Amino acid sequence: MSQNGQFLEYTLQVIRRGVEMGGFPEDFYKLLSRPKRIIQVSIPVKMDNGSYEVFEGYRVQHNDALGPFKGGIRFHPEVTLADDIALAMLMTLKNSLAGLPYGGAKGAVRVDPRRLSRRELEELARGYARAVAPLIGEQLDIPAPDVGTDSQVMAWMVDEYSKLAGRNAPAVFTSKPPELWGNPVREYSTGFGVAVAAREVAKRLWGGIEGKTVAVHGAGNTGAWAAYWLEKMGAKVVAISDTRGTVVNKAGIPGEQILKVYMEKKRDKSATVLALEGEKIADSNASLYQDVDILVPAAIENVVREDNVGLVRARLVVEGANGPTTPGAERRLYERGVVVVPDILANAGGVIMSYLEWVENLQWLFWDEEETRRRLEAIMSNNVARVYARWEKEKSWTMRDAAVVTALERIYNAMKTRGWI
């Protein structure tokens, strides 16, 4: 997590720049620089040893001009309210850019979920759902998983909310297990979307992604699935890292093997990509510095900074994580001719899939995996095409500028039409 509100500061810089470049009034920035609502909750959990711990949680509802609030719930020991505000702001931009009928929100609990037993984790999840229940709902705020949470956590939360509501309420939470109103595509939707974004930009830059080399920073859900789908699309993954280090193999690292490690890690926390064939490097950031065509930072924010951007050698950076590149580092990359596909465009596959699941749940219908993936791919491809065309037109802009201004236009028009501005 960021220190001293740095991530929030960077996010506000992005919004400020977008407002200025888009020619929006100053009042628009003032309204976007503060969330509409901040919910702070205390969640008591009876631990396995019989004692009680009280965990601090948040739900930040940033802007709902376009529709219900939408964003994930993060369980992390170092999460701060400032981080949560920044992430909610990014969700507002991401949802707008994707053309979804959502505003932006984010939730968090300050906890290390790895230190909880399954029973303790379930009690915490249900406690959080109870605490925020009065201010969420299928037409109000629709949470989903994020770092430290998963489909099982969503299952506990939707069950708890349904008990409180006195009815089945599948559309209140998304990214649920397929056994409980979920869709199998959600497991890999973010990574798949990152791969689609990389493919579509590579097609326009170089004529295609076939044979292009890729390094992935982060072997969690987004990184592992992005690697898998990039290989399926014809690219060659030559480096990938996790918290224990980096493995490099110029001959290529099979996507199925990367996925296997990711799946093993769900059962055994000691599983690592260092078990894969190739050169082992103790530094997990070594994947950022490989001589490759495409870099996918897919772990945490602020990993490409002004103090290390000179070591980045990729020609194209596709942001799988939220905020992995600081504004100063991005300016340096831009000056060197390195293209950065911003997070609000590249990693929107997860929330687009959440939207599709929400639509299914509201209507009590179900699309099969192939149809769902087709719809997701079409939305991602169209979004990239729109942003790329605008970026080409505005020669002095970065692709993030094009994405942010495009997102802000939709939000501004909705707020103006409502009479909010």
Swiss-Prot record:
Tagged with keyword Translocase: no
Record InterPro entries: Aminoacid_DH-like_N_sf, Glu/Leu/Phe/Val/Trp_DH, Glu/Leu/Phe/Val/Trp_DH_C, Glu/Leu/Phe/Val/Trp_DH_dimer, Glu_DH, NAD(P)-bd_dom_sf, NAD_bind_Glu_DH
Pfam families: ELFV_dehydrog, ELFV_dehydrog_N
pH-linked activity: Optimum pH is 9.5 for oxidative deamination, and 9.0 for reductive amination. Retains more than 80% of its activity after incubation for 30 minutes at pH 4.5-9.5.
SMART domains: ELFV_dehydrog (SM00839)
Annotated keywords: NADP, Oxidoreductase
GO terms, molecular function: glutamate dehydrogenase (NAD+) activity; glutamate dehydrogenase (NADP+) activity; NADP+ binding; NADPH binding
Enzyme class name: oxidoreductase
Organism superkingdom: Archaea
Catalytic center residues: K106 (proton donor)
Tagged with keyword Oxidoreductase: yes
Subunit structure, interactors included: Homohexamer.
Protein's UniProt name: NADP(+)-dependent glutamate dehydrogenase
